C-alpha cells in the first residue's frame, strides 16, 4: 500500500494503517498535534483505517479543515455540558464556523450570560475526563427511534429529511451521543483552551417561519496563549465596531423600516463619495470606461444568464405590463448587453468596462450585520472582454490595480487561486488555459499564493484577495474571475484578424467588492480615524470665545474655498471641551484661534497625529494639508514617548 504525502514523498506499508498510526510513523510530534486527516481530498478522522493507495495529508490546527475538526469537537463538548447541567434542553445543530463554533438549542428557560461560566466549568471537567470519541452508524429507522426516545425532535426532523436507505453517522463521548458526519478528535483531552463568547437568537433551519432557537457561540484553541490573543483581538474589535462608530461619527444608520438597507448620512456620503472619486480616478488611468446599467431588467435576460434558475430566491422580482422583471443582484448581464450593443473587432479588445452598480440581494434577516451584510449595496464591478492571448496581461493589470488600492489603505493581503470544481462547465482545454493564465500572471508578478483545488466557480477559475486589517482579521474583498459561460450563453462575438467570428473571454473583477462593506471594514481598520484625504471633516476651526468668531469664520471660508472640508464649533464652551470633542470625532486637524492668532494672522494647529504642532500662517497650513490630501498619505500617530 503506497501513501503519497502532501510534500510529494511517499511511504509503503504491507498492511492497512489508521491515519493516526501513519502520523506517528512520520513523527511523534506530528501525531501529537494532528486533528484529522485528508484522504484523496476527503477529510476523515484520525482513527480512519486506510487500506489502499492514496494521497494523505495529516491536518493540524494550522490547517482550516483541521481547525474545523478541533472546534467541531469543542461544540460537542459544550452540548454535552449543557445536557448535563440542563437535561431538558433540546439540541439542534452545532457546527464549527470561521472563528469558532456554535450550537443551537431549545429550552423553555433560555440561557443567560451568567450560565456560560457554569457551562465552561462543566466543559473543563469533560476535557479532564479524557473521554474517547467514537464513531458508529445506524440505519435510518433505528436512528429516528433512538432520538424519539431521547426526546430530540430537531434531530428526528433532520434524519427524516434523509432518504430511507440512508445510513446515519453518530459520534459518542461518555454518556453523550450526537448525530454527526464528523470528523472529530480522538478524545476530549486536546481541547485545552476555550471560551463561550455570546448568546443570540437563530431561527431553526434559518427560516423566519420556524421557531426561534438560542444560539450559543464559542471559540477554542490548543493553547491558552492563542485563545488570549484572540480574545484581546475581539475586545479591540468591539471598540472598533463599525455599527457603534458609524452612529457616533454620524456616518450611516439602519432603520427597522428598511432592514438591510443602509441610510448614508451627510458625513457618510462624503466618505463614500471620496472612495467613488478615487475609484473613478484610478480606473480612468488604467484604461477603463465607465458605464451604468438599469437597476431592473426582464426575466428573459436573467433566464439567459442563468440567474433566474440558480439565484431567484435571492432576487427581488416584480411584474410590469404583465411581464416578470427582477431588480439586479449582479451587474454582469447588463454589462454584456452593452458589449453586444455594437459589432466588436479584435482591435477593440481588451474592452474594460467598469460600473458602480447598485445591486439588491435578499439576505435572510438573521444574517444581516450593519454594513457588512446588507440587502442593497454598490458593487465596484468591472468586466473585461478580451482575446485568449490577452488574458494573462489583463490579469496582471488587475492584480497591480488591486495591490495599489490595498497598499494605499495599509492593508496586507494574501492570495488564493481556486481551480476547477467537479461540477463545472466548459472544455478541459478552456479550463487548462484559464488556470494557467491565472497561475502564470501571479508567478510573473512574484506574488505568493495558495491553491484551493476544486474551489473555483462552475464557470471558471478565480483569484481571491484576502486583506488583513489593523487588528489581524482577514476579509475577502477582491476577486478576479474568468468566465467562459456567459459569453457562450449570450453568443458574444468579435471579428478576429482572420476576418472570422470568435468568442471573447470575459473577466469579472471587483476591488472593493461591496462599497458599503468596504466602508465598514475601513471604519474598523482605522477605528474611525481616517486618513486626512478620506476624512469626512478634515479640519475643525475652534474659536476660543465669541470675540474671535469673525476671524474664525474667515479661516473657515478660506479652508472651504480651497477645497478643504472644514467645520466651525460656534458653541459657548471652553476650548478644552471643544478640543476633546473634536478628538472624539476623530478629526485630523483642529485650528484654535484667539487674540494672538487674529492679531498675527495665524492659526494654532492641533493634530490627531502629534498633538500641538505650533502656529502657522493659514497659507502655510493650507499648502501642507492640500499636499497631504493630494498625495493621499496617511500620517501615523506618534506614540507618547516619541512626542
Task: Give residue ranges: language-model regions.
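NTP/phosphate- and nucleic-acid-binding module
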Residues: 1-92, 97-643
